[in-house]
Amino acid sequence: MAQEQTKRGGGGGEDDDLTGSTAAGQERREKLTDETDDLLDEIDDVLEENAEDFVRAYVQKGGQ
């Protein structure tokens, strides 16, 4: 049984843009985290108010 390994080179020489994209990536990550937390809080509120209907609707839509 033979196995082949392929090595791929990176972008090469684009390290100067790394700090700018890292800061932008961090900002985007924080924004997405906040949005996700808000969405999860909203789901928690719905489940606290009416979990039975939520589960019933989920099962009717084909959930398992």
UniProtKB/Swiss-Prot annotation:
<dbReference type="GO" id="GO:0019941">
    <property type="term" value="P:modification-dependent protein catabolic process"/>
</dbReference>
<comment type="function">
    <text>Protein modifier that is covalently attached to lysine residues of substrate proteins, thereby targeting them for proteasomal degradation. The tagging system is termed pupylation.</text>
</comment>
<dbReference type="InterPro" id="IPR008515">
    <property type="entry name" value="Ubiquitin-like_Pup"/>
</dbReference>
<feature type="region of interest" description="Disordered">
    <location>
        <begin position="1"/>
        <end position="37"/>
    </location>
</feature>
<dbReference type="GO" id="GO:0070490">
    <property type="term" value="P:protein pupylation"/>
</dbReference>
<keyword id="KW-1017">Isopeptide bond</keyword>
<feature type="modified residue" description="Deamidated glutamine">
    <location>
        <position position="64"/>
    </location>
</feature>
<feature type="region of interest" description="ARC ATPase binding">
    <location>
        <begin position="21"/>
        <end position="58"/>
    </location>
</feature>
<dbReference type="GO" id="GO:0010498">
    <property type="term" value="P:proteasomal protein catabolic process"/>
</dbReference>
<keyword id="KW-0833">Ubl conjugation pathway</keyword>
<feature type="cross-link" description="Isoglutamyl lysine isopeptide (Gln-Lys) (interchain with K-? in acceptor proteins)">
    <location>
        <position position="64"/>
    </location>
</feature>
<feature type="coiled-coil region">
    <location>
        <begin position="23"/>
        <end position="52"/>
    </location>
</feature>
<comment type="similarity">
    <text>Belongs to the prokaryotic ubiquitin-like protein family.</text>
</comment>
<keyword id="KW-0175">Coiled coil</keyword>
<comment type="pathway">
    <text>Protein degradation; proteasomal Pup-dependent pathway.</text>
</comment>
<dbReference type="Pfam" id="PF05639">
    <property type="entry name" value="Pup"/>
</dbReference>
<dbReference type="GO" id="GO:0070628">
    <property type="term" value="F:proteasome binding"/>
</dbReference>
<dbReference type="GO" id="GO:0031386">
    <property type="term" value="F:protein tag activity"/>
</dbReference>
<protein>
    <recommendedName>
        <fullName>Prokaryotic ubiquitin-like protein Pup</fullName>
    </recommendedName>
</protein>
<comment type="subunit">
    <text>Strongly interacts with the proteasome-associated ATPase ARC through a hydrophobic interface; the interacting region of Pup lies in its C-terminal half. There is one Pup binding site per ARC hexamer ring.</text>
</comment>
